[in-house]
């Protein structure tokens, strides 16, 4: 869902 996509985006930005 949207939460999963947002979590992936945050993970990508933080890495």
Curated annotation (Swiss-Prot):
Expressed by the skin glands. Keywords: Amidation, Amphibian defense peptide, Secreted. One of its GO terms (biological process) is negative regulation of nitric-oxide synthase activity. The modification Serine amide is found at residue 15. It is found in: Secreted. It comes from the Eukaryota. The keyword Secreted applies. GO terms for cellular component: extracellular region. Transmembrane segments: none annotated. Inhibits the formation of NO by neuronal nitric oxide synthase with an IC(50) of 26.4 uM. This is Signiferin-4.2. The lineage of its organism: Eukaryota, Metazoa, Chordata, Craniata, Vertebrata.
